[in-house]
Amino acid sequence: MNQAVGTQILTLTGLRFDANLGILDHEKAAPQPIQVDAELRLGVQPLAPRDDDIGHVLDYRRVRQIIIDECKAEHVNLLESLIGKLAHRLMQLPGVLGVRVKIAKLEIFDDCEVAIRIETGQW
């Protein structure tokens, strides 16, 4: 009997924390709040895992921690630099075929947020 399959995408939405990011004096002086959204395309997977064991799937706790660690590792001047570094790191996870990431500076301006989005790999 054939097992049913579907395309699986792991999504983390609205992950908020402070990071050292930016070129403005106040950005260099203190961390600022950012928000990260990430989608990881895992490709065709069984509709249900072969068993109920976390060791046989991509653990979203690990993905969350990688995002936080990469974004907090060091001061980065540009959103473009940070998102490229993060997307590259997420693409290295086992089974990941494609990555979509968005990083937003939440308080850079009084009247809006500023964000950048990148997509890499297979979609």
Walk through the language-model features, giving the residues of each:
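N-terminal, polar/charged subdomain of small-to-medium soluble alpha/beta proteins
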Residues: 1-123
